[in-house]
């Protein structure tokens, strides 16, 4: 049976992550409060931030920026939006 969490991002109970996706205390908070669905949405957002801002993940500052954005995305006011991004209309 899948592990269920009360997802902080989706505001509902959903299937939890299989393991902490990030080291340390932040990884533990993510594992306890974020669903697989919300994590998949973050990975798409993160990819846009990396591509649009031309981040070099070998650079410590780029990795720190992404960690701050991840924390804001799940536990704060929301991550930055990739400049020029227009969400698809349904």
Curated annotation (Swiss-Prot):
Disulfide bonds: none annotated. Coiled coil: none annotated. It comes from the Bacteria. This is Probable Fe(2+)-trafficking protein. Pfam families: Iron_traffic. Keywords: Iron. SUPFAM superfamilies: YggX-like (SSF111148). GO terms for molecular function: iron ion binding. PANTHER family: FE(2+)-TRAFFICKING PROTEIN-RELATED. GO terms for cellular component: cytosol. GO terms for biological process: cellular response to oxidative stress. It comes from Variovorax paradoxus (strain S110). Belongs to the Fe(2+)-trafficking protein family.
């Amino acid at each position: 049976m899948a592990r269920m969490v009360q997802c902080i991002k989706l505001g509902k109970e959903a299937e939890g992550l299989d393991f902490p996706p990030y080291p340390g205390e932040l990884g533990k908070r993510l594992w306890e409060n974020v669903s697989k669905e919300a994590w998949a949405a973050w990975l798409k957002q993160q990819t846009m931030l990396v591509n649009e801002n031309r981040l070099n993940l070998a650079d410590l500052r780029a990795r720190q920026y992404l960690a701050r954005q991840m924390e804001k995305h799940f536990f704060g006011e929301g991550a930055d939006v990739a400049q020029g991004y227009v969400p698809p209309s349904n």
